Design a protein with these regions (language model features):
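Acetyl-CoA-dependent GNAT
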Residues: 3-92, 100-109, 113
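Short acidic/polar active-site loop segments enriched in Thr and Asp
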Residues: 116
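Conserved beta-strand-loop-alpha-helix junction that forms the acyl-donor binding cleft
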Residues: 94, 119-124
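Conserved G/P- and acidic residue-centered "switch" motifs that form tight phosphate/ATP-binding loops
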Residues: 97
């Protein structure tokens, strides 16, 4: 099993991250098109304004295909805090320490930028 973690945008990652979230949460709690559309829209907006000094995006890939992600949206870090977003690992890589590695990278990124607050939102 070849799992790697890459930083930054990779072609196809917006669609793949949206798909992973949509399939998992559809099965788990019945979320539908509104959820998938929101994930895709907000992730696309984030990627379009991505600033490597302010924001972070890490992708876990299994044999070259995205199977996990985490992001730090630092746009409002000075006022509201850094926004931890799109933290997910697929069933194929869950439980192998990749989720901890992704979270560690995101938290290290925040520490290096002196982001004092980090928040996570949920969808209901």
């Amino acid at each position: 099993m070849d799992i790697s973690i890459e930083k930054g945008y990779v072609p196809g990652c917006i669609g793949r991250i949206s798909e992973l979230h949509a399939r998992y949460y559809s099965r788990l709690v019945g979320f539908g098109v509104a959820f998938e559309a929101r994930v895709a829209r907000e992730l696309a907006e984030f990627c379009a304004r991505y600033d490597d000094q302010r924001d972070g995006l890490w992708l876990a890939a299994l044999n070259g295909q995205v199977h996990g992600s985490i992001a730090i949206d630092g746009m409002l870090a000075g006022s509201e805090g850094a926004h931890l977003r799109w933290f997910f690992t697929s069933d194929e890589i869950r439980g192998k320490g990749i989720d901890s590695a992704l979270l560690g990278l995101a938290l290290d990124f925040c520490r290096k930028r002196d982001y004092r607050n980090i928040f996570l939102t949920t969808f209901a």
